[in-house]
Amino acid sequence: MEIRAEEISEIIRKQIKEYGSEVEVAETGTIISIGDGIARIHGLDKAMAGELLEFPGGISGMALNLEEDNVGAAILGEFSEIKEGDTVKRTNRIVEVPVGEALIGRVVNAIGQPIDGKGPINTDKFGKVEVKAPGIVKRKSVHQPMQTGLKAIDAMVPIGRGQRELIIGDRQTGKTAVAIDTIINQKGGDVVCIYVAIGQKRSTVAQVVSKLQEHGAMDYTIIVAATASEPAPLQFISPYTGVTMGEYFRDNGKHALIIYDDLSKQAVAYRQLSLLLRRPPGREAYPGDVFYLHSRLLERACKVSDACGAGSLTALPIIETQAGDVSAYIPTNVISITDGQIYLESDLFYSGVRPAINVGLSVSRVGGSAQVKAMKQVAGTLRLSLAQYREMAAFAQFGSDLDKATQMQLARGERLVEVLKQPQYRPIPNEKQVLIIFAANNGYIDEYPVASLGRYESELYSFFDARKSDLLAELRDKKAIDDDIKAKIVSALEEFKKEFTA
């Protein structure tokens, strides 16, 4: 086939026109050593702290140590296929994770990839994993209640929206149970829940997911899982991934609740990373910035001012203690960062007081101003009564000849402790909690044996549901007990007293 001269010039013109001078420039480096989820890379001179790096096989990494001659990076994924001499690319982006409504109801890993087999997550919104917490001007004091559905907490250690309340205790004392009950109690409300599982067994996470599905709570819950079998970098980053997802709702005028279960394991993972990166160890071999690790995470939970959308992000971090030692390094750090703590005790747990909350050591520093007024009215004397009961019970062990007043106080205390017990996965609405505590405080349960109080409580709720639902509705709407409502409650309790037989 012959080509004429004018055609040649035409072809050349076309080629020149279509010629693209774009050359892809990527700054690359070479892995000089790798092991235990940490890679040292030579040649990435312009890398940023926290930058996303691209390893062979589509695996991501995060630049943590920027040294003179190399970069120390944590590999966010399986690193068995990566070897010395491999090429690593810069992405010029800080580590980001997907955020938005599309994540609700899903189970994702520490970098926001779905692991529940329900297909990809359809969202075009991404959030940076490391951002600064809102400043003072953007915040507002906590003033709305975050109901947990647990009588002992809502009455004596109330939590508000935007608060950080630590749940602390030994292993097997019901810490996760308190958190899961709080999630279940948000059903039908306007709170999006995020549960971050750090360093837990996969079977435990699967159990949590199935329990939440059973109670219809996955409809408003996101689960971020970095299980025990995953590398330390993923366990370290997962709480930041969770809080980034929560911030999306907070900044869009919505309310979110995030649970970190638990931050002790995140600190251990961070200690491992830091030691492998050759950062100098401090107390208990943790690095010097382990306080900052948790403070920058928990400061991102807050109540936002009306000008910024009036959203909120409430955090319930969990810390596991060893043999009740609250004065260890990580527990004291997190206690000082948070706005109060719920202390769970193994002695109480094994003696049948569940939730096993030690009322003397548990405190809520800001929740009082967020507590529902009706609850404040009935629970005002509760903490004092329980403290007096505990003191008397300690003395009563030594002597048997107690006067009548002391015996009555001990009997009342026993009944109060019994009333505050609650089975798992059965959160109670606020207005019903107010009723049972009102009955306990005003002596309506004093004449019944302690063993029959569980039945008294359930029958009382059934009685009010069936015959006094208008009073429950009034209490729910007014959120306070005025003289009129008080008279109605008293007459209803008197009516119930005639019907109930212990």
From Swiss-Prot:
GO cellular component, one term: plasma membrane
Location(s), subcellular: Cell inner membrane
SUPFAM superfamilies linked: C-terminal domain of alpha and beta subunits of F1 ATP synthase (SSF47917), N-terminal domain of alpha and beta subunits of F1 ATP synthase (SSF50615), P-loop containing nucleoside triphosphate hydrolases (SSF52540)
Keywords assigned: ATP synthesis, ATP-binding, Cell inner membrane, Cell membrane, CF(1), Hydrogen ion transport, Ion transport, Membrane, Nucleotide-binding, Translocase, Transport
Superkingdom, natural source: Bacteria
Catalytic activity: ATP + H2O + 4 H(+)(in) = ADP + phosphate + 5 H(+)(out)
Enzyme class: translocase
GO molecular function, one term: ATP binding
CDD domains: ATP-synt_F1_alpha_C, ATP-synt_F1_alpha_N, F1-ATPase_alpha_CD
Enzyme Commission (EC) number: 7.1.2.2
Binding residues annotated for ATP, in chain numbering: G169, D170, R171, Q172, T173, G174, K175, T176
Role this protein plays: Produces ATP from ADP in the presence of a proton gradient across the membrane. The alpha chain is a regulatory subunit.
Assembly and interaction partners: F-type ATPases have 2 components, CF(1) - the catalytic core - and CF(0) - the membrane proton channel. CF(1) has five subunits: alpha(3), beta(3), gamma(1), delta(1), epsilon(1). CF(0) has three main subunits: a(1), b(2) and c(9-12). The alpha and beta chains form an alternating ring which encloses part of the gamma chain. CF(1) is attached to CF(0) by a central stalk formed by the gamma and epsilon chains, while a peripheral stalk is formed by the delta and b chains.
Family: Belongs to the ATPase alpha/beta chains family.
PANTHER family for this protein: ATP SYNTHASE SUBUNIT ALPHA, MITOCHONDRIAL
Name this polypeptide is given: ATP synthase subunit alpha
Native species: Geotalea daltonii (strain DSM 22248 / JCM 15807 / FRC-32) (Geobacter daltonii)
